[in-house]
């Protein structure tokens, strides 16, 4: 009887442990996969600082190019494409959080003018849906529908990101006017070098925190190193911790200086930002312009006809 109770108790404990492990895995995986947007959204009320710098550059230190393409002008209540290109060498591999090498992810933030927002699914054409693929965009804040974030997503598949945008209608939104507006964009490829709390990731170079001699280099079981540096002047010992990923550049017995690189820089990615302009065009102005062009063309036609008629009259008079 006691054996049965013991077995039942053990079985119950095992089920609880497995359930807790699964929950932790799901929560952890979700937080990692959503890391890029969450880092920016949690740390900053607005992703664009007063200086014009997009805050993603605070964590992604390398500067890389991006390209944004939008129509020159759009009509009110119209769906259009904003195409962001994040170019990089597809053969490159980045250092992952566990120190291993893997493909680069990309992410982006698109800052639209007030009133512009992500197009609803029922307004997106089949052709545009095909260009978008399986991307899932989200607003930076519930009250900031004009700021969109995406990522991290696989760079090999989404180095070109198509945003479906709905233009506002000044007839229904009184704070929107027919004007030229700026659009700002930021795009990254690869992991960042600094976390939002200021700590370093393993995707950056590690420097010596003291001048001295490398007394000992201990290779850790799960990867990475502990480097013991002894100051020759006072015998003070400092231990620098190197996470898995960066390659070591120093050896035991070597003299080093403060801030001297202890590792290579494994970062192959970077962040870039750009801007574009778009005109919210008044349909009446377009109609007026078309009417003007039509008037000019008709005037030219009538002028040609009148000239030919005059030439015929002259020719007729000359025959008499």
Curated annotation (Swiss-Prot):
> What are its cofactors?
heme
Which residues does the record give as heme binding sites? 36, 56, 59-60
GO terms of molecular function: electron transfer activity; heme binding; iron ion binding
Any Gene Ontology CC annotation: chloroplast thylakoid membrane
What main location does UniProt list? plastid
Nuclease found in the keyword field: no
Leader sequence range is 1-35
Give membrane topology per the record: Single-pass membrane protein
Localization terms from the record:
Plastid, Chloroplast thylakoid membrane
Q: HAMAP family per the record?
A: Cytb6_f_cytF
Please state what the protein is called: Cytochrome f
Originating organism = Sorghum bicolor
């Amino acid at each position: 009887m006691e054996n049965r109770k013991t077995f039942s108790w053990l079985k119950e404990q095992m089920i609880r442990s497995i359930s807790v492990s699964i929950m932790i895995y799901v929560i952890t995986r979700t937080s990692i996969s959503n890391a890029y947007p969450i880092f920016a959204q949690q740390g900053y009320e607005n992703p664009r600082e007063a200086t014009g710098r997009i805050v993603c550059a605070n964590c992604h230190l390398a500067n890389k190019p991006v390209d944004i393409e939008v129509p020159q002008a759009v009509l009110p209540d119209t769906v259009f494409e904003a195409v962001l290109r994040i170019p990089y060498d597809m053969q490159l591999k980045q250092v992952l959080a566990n120190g291993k090498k893997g493909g680069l992810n990309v992410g982006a933030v698109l800052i639209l003018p007030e009133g512009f927002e992500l197009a609803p699914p029922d307004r997106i054409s089949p052709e545009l849906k095909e260009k978008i693929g399986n991307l899932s965009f989200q607003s930076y804040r519930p009250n900031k529908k004009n700021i969109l974030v995406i990522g991290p997503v696989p760079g090999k598949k989404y180095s070109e990101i198509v945003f479906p945008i709905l233009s506002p209608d000044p007839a229904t939104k009184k704070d929107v006017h027919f004007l030229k507006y700026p659009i700002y964009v930021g795009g990254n490829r690869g992991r960042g070098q600094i976390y939002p709390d200021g700590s370093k990731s393993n995707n950056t170079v590690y420097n010596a925190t003291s001048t001295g001699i490398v007394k000992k280099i201990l290779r850790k079981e799960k990867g990475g190193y502990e480097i013991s540096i002894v100051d020759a002047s006072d015998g003070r010992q400092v231990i620098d911790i190197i996470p898995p990923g960066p390659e070591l550049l120093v050896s035991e017995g070597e003299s080093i200086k403060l801030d001297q690189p202890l590792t290579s820089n494994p970062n192959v990615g970077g962040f870039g930002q750009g801007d574009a302009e778009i005109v919210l065009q008044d349909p009446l102005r377009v109609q007026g312009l078309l009417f003007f062009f039509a008037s000019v063309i008709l005037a030219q036609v009538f002028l040609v006809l009148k000239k030919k008629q005059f030439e015929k009259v002259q020719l007729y008079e000359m025959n008499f």
